[in-house]
Each structure stands twice: as structure tokens, then as C-alpha cells.
Curated annotation (Swiss-Prot):
It is found in: Cytoplasm. It comes from Clostridium kluyveri (strain ATCC 8527 / DSM 555 / NBRC 12016 / NCIMB 10680 / K1). It catalyses: 2-formamido-N(1)-(5-O-phospho-beta-D-ribosyl)acetamidine + ATP = 5-amino-1-(5-phospho-beta-D-ribosyl)imidazole + ADP + phosphate + H(+). Belongs to the AIR synthase family. This is Phosphoribosylformylglycinamidine cyclo-ligase. NCBIfam families: purM (TIGR00878).
Length: 331
């Protein structure tokens, strides 16, 4: 008799992984969660809003996963998966409510899958949202043995009158940059082309470990700011770096004039540049030390930076807005 296991799908390992995942996801539950992992669908009660708008985002971790497999460090990329989604919906003023994940692999290893979900749960707790569902797909022959792919889906809510869309941006507004934790989750295909050995020493740690530093989650500090200040537009600096992401927060034709010397560039970016990547390409690929940008009235900028610093975030005035064509000008 031929069984499903003979084809490469281990149902028992799947049951084991779900049991481990449930323990981690339960730690993320917040008011509004009506059920958790194991049901056919996750349910969340919206609660009291006057005119709620649901805001959704989906993303993955990309080839950063390749380094995780090589280093055998699996939990940090789960945080990345959450960060990439919740930081995006935050750009429109949304508070993340719940998260779902998708894991795909050739042959399921319960402990590895559980470590990935452990990281996702940590990311959800950092963002204040609940992990209420997901899918783990075991597909023999589709992926290389020992490798996983990962994607996430975040849903948040914002009152309709409070949606942030860049419509109030004016010439003279100031750009506040919040520091990144490193490379975050973009540009890893380029890094992997340049680097052969991820075990090499980098300021006392293995380079691979430094590259696996999780993407910073900006949800809690930015939501705190929104209680006190009018933030006109926000940008999450992901793939495409400064050049692609900063113009996305403007509805009209504005130029973001950025002072490259106004913020600290982490050593990891200097290292990548030394491997042969020119500066313009770096700013068109990486966050260069700024993971999130706020567009605010110039009079509010000093207090916003003060509040961010008090919340443990490094923040800088990195530039200003001029009415010109929609682009970024680095000085």
C-alpha cells in the first residue's frame, strides 16, 4: 500500500508542528480575538469604531531566508515577516489588529516550522496584533530540501477621518527619519552575490548573524506619536530604498531633499559599499540606516524627535519638502 508519507508528505509531523505553533500564537491574543489556530478561519471582533476602514498588507522575507537556512537561525525571519506587513499598513495610520502567515517547504520539520512561527508571534507581540491563522504547505519536489518560503498578511484599522494619505503635505514640511536596525529585509540577493562566507567576523559577530538582525517594527512608537501630533505622510523604506519609497508618501509633485550627513549610516552598509556597490545604487536598494520616514510640520519636528528618543528610537531631521517634480534629491 502506498501512503501519503511515501510521496514525501508527513502528516504526523504536520500535527506536531501545529501543536507547537498554537502555543506561540496564543501568546499574541488581544481583545477581539474570537478563535485561534486550528479552525477553518480566524475570527476577530472589530469593536467600537465610528467609521472604521480596514487596511491590509502582505509581504514576505525574500532571500534573507537563504542566510537563515545557512546559519540555522530560524526565529528572527518570522519577526521580519510581520514587520514588513505591519510597517506598511502603519503608513496610512492603521493600528494592526491581526496577522496570518503562509509557510511552504519541501519536507516539514516541526521544530523548524515552530521556530519560524515563534518569530512571527514575537513580531505580532511587538506590533500589538494577534496571530489568528495560517497555512503550512508541504510540497515535496517543489522546494529544495531544508528550505522554506514565508509570507504574511496583516489587517489593521483606522477611523476614516484619520487616514494618512499625504494629501496635506506642504512645501517646507520636515522629514523625520527613524533609525533602522540594519539591512532589514531587502537587497539580500545583492548581498548574497557579493558575499561567499557568512561566518566571517564582523565586529565580533558572524556576518550572517548581523545580516539576520530583524527588521525594526515601528508600530507602537508611531501610534503613540499619532495621539499627540499631526503626521501628514509616512514611508516605510523597503525595496527601492529612498528613491522609490519616499515619493510614494506624496499625493502631489513634491521633492524630498535629503541630507545624507544628517543621520548615522550603520557599518553594514559601509561594508556592502566596500564590496563594490556605488552610493546611488545603495540608496536605490537599501534603507541606509533610516527604516521609516515621517513628514511633519516643521514646528512639530523637535518635539517628535524628543518623544521618539524617549521611547528608545533614534530619530533625525533628515530633510525637507519642496514643490517640484515627485522625486528624491540627496545632498
Amino acid at each position: 500500500m502506498v501512503t501519503y508519507k511515501d510521496s514525501g508528505v508527513n502528516i504526523e509531523e504536520g500535527y506536531k508542528s501545529v501543536k507547537l505553533m498554537k502555543e506561540y500564537s496564543a501568546q499574541t491574543f488581544i481583545p477581539g480575538v474570537l478563535n485561534g489556530l486550528g479552525s477553518f478561519a480566524g475570527m476577530f471582533e472589530l469593536g467600537k469604531y465610528k467609521n472604521p476602514v480596514l487596511v491590509s498588507g502582505t509581504d514576505g522575507v525574500g532571500t534573507k531566508l537563504k542566510i537563515a537556512f545557512e546559519m540555522k537561525i530560524y526565529d528572527t525571519v518570522g519577526i521580519d515577516c510581520v514587520a514588513m506587513c505591519v510597517n506598511d499598513i502603519l503608513c496610512h495610520g492603521a493600528k494592526p489588529l491581526f496577522f496570518l502567515d503562509y509557510l511552504a517547504c519541501s519536507n516539514l520539520e516541526a521544530e523548524v516550522a515552530a521556530e519560524l512561527v515563534k518569530g512571527i508571534s514575537k513580531g505580532c507581540m511587538d506590533a500589538g496584533c494577534a496571530l489568528i491563522g495560517g497555512e503550512t504547505a508541504e510540497m515535496p519536489g517543489f522546494y529544495s530540501k531544508g528550505e522554506y518560503d514565508m509570507a504574511g498578511f496583516a489587517v489593521g484599522v483606522v477611523e476614516k477621518d484619520n487616514i494618512i494619505n499625504g494629501s496635506t503635505v506642504e512645501e517646507g514640511d520636515v522629514l523625520v527619519g527613524i533609525a533602522s536596525s540594519g539591512v532589514h529585509s531587502n537587497g539580500y540577493s545583492l548581498v548574497r552575490k557579493l558575499v561567499d562566507n557568512f561566518q566571517v567576523d564582523f565586529f565580533g559577530s558572524a556576518l550572517g548573524e548581523v545580516l539576520l538582525t530583524p527588521t525594526r517594527i515601528y508600530v507602537k512608537p508611531v501610534l503613540k506619536l499619532l495621539e499627540k501630533f499631526k503626521i501628514k505622510a509616512m514611508a516605510h523604506i523597503t525595496g527601492g530604498g529612498f528613491y522609490e519609497n519616499i515619493p510614494r508618501m506624496f499625493k502631489e509633485d513634491f521633492t524630498a531633499v535629503i541630507d545624507k550627513n544628517s543621520f548615522e549610516m550603520p557599518e553594514i552598509f559601509k561594508y556592502i559599499m566596500d564590496l563594490g556597490v556605488d552610493e546611488e545604487h545603495m540608496y536605490n536598494t537599501y534603507n541606509m540606516g533610516i527604516g521609516f520616514v515621517l513628514c511633519v510640520d516643521s514646528k512639530d519636528a523637535p518635539d517628535i524627535i524628543k518623544d521618539l528618543n524617549e521611547m528608545g528610537e533614534k530619530a533625525y531631521i533628515i530633510g525637507h519638502v519642496k514643490r517640484r517634480e515627485k522625486r528624491v534629491c540627496l545632498k
